[in-house]
Regions:
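Mature-chain termini and adjacent capping regions
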Residues: 1-163
Length: 163
C-alpha cells in the first residue's frame, strides 16, 4: 500500500492544532506520525467509487506536536492521488502536547487547497480552547497559515484571566 496519501493526511492533522497557536519553530526533530483505527478501507481506484481512505473505530493520530481522536476519519483524494480534503467525525478532539490549546467538535473538515479547518455543529457547538479563551460557535473556521479564526452562527467567547 502506498503510504504517501496517508502521510499527506497527517499533514492536515498537524495543521489543525498549529492553527490554534503558532509554533515558534517547525518540528525539526522529525518524529513519527502514527494513525491507528480498528479498520481502514482504502480505495484509490476511481472506477470502484470515490478515491478515499476511511478509518473507522477509535481513530487516533499521534504526532510529535499533538494527538487527535475521533470515531471516523475520511481522506478524500484527487485524480492525481493528492489529498483534497480530510473529514473527521464523531467526538473529534485535537490536543497540543504542550498543553496550549485543544479543539472539540462533532465534525472537522480540512480543505488542503484553501488550508482551512472547519469545525462544525451537528447537535452541539464546537469549541476551540486556548490558555486564555474558549470560543464556541455553530461553525468555527481556522486558517492555520494566517493565524486567523472566523465564526458563523451563534457564537460566544469566554475569556479567562491567566493565573
Amino acid at each position: 500500500m502506498n503510504l504517501l496519501p496517508l502521510l499527506a493526511a497527517t499533514f492536515w492533522v498537524s495543521s489543525l492544532v498549529y492553527a490554534q497557536t503558532p509554533d515558534p519553530a517547525p518540528n525539526a526533530g522529525g518524529g513519527q506520525t502514527v494513525i491507528t483505527s480498528e479498520t481502514l478501507d482504502l480505495n484509490l481506484n476511481k472506477t470502484k467509487g470515490p478515491k478515499q481512505g476511511l478509518f473507522r473505530g477509535n481513530v487516533k493520530v499521534d504526532e510529535p506536536r499533538f494527538t487527535m481522536v475521533s470515531k471516523e476519519m475520511t481522506v478524500f483524494f484527487a485524480e492525481d492521488d493528492s489529498v483534497e480534503n480530510v473529514e473527521a467525525r464523531e467526538e473529534v478532539v485535537i490536543k497540543r502536547k504542550d498543553g496550549t490549546s485543544e479543539t472539540w467538535s462533532e465534525k472537522a473538515v480540512y480543505n488542503m487547497k484553501e488550508k482551512k479547518l472547519t469545525l462544525l455543529k451537528v447537535t452541539k457547538q464546537p469549541k476551540a480552547i486556548s490558555q486564555d479563551k474558549t470560543v464556541f460557535a455553530d461553525k468555527i473556521i481556522l486558517f492555520p497559515e494566517e493565524d486567523k479564526m472566523l465564526t458563523e452562527g451563534a457564537s460566544r467567547v469566554m475569556l479567562q484571566k491567566a493565573p
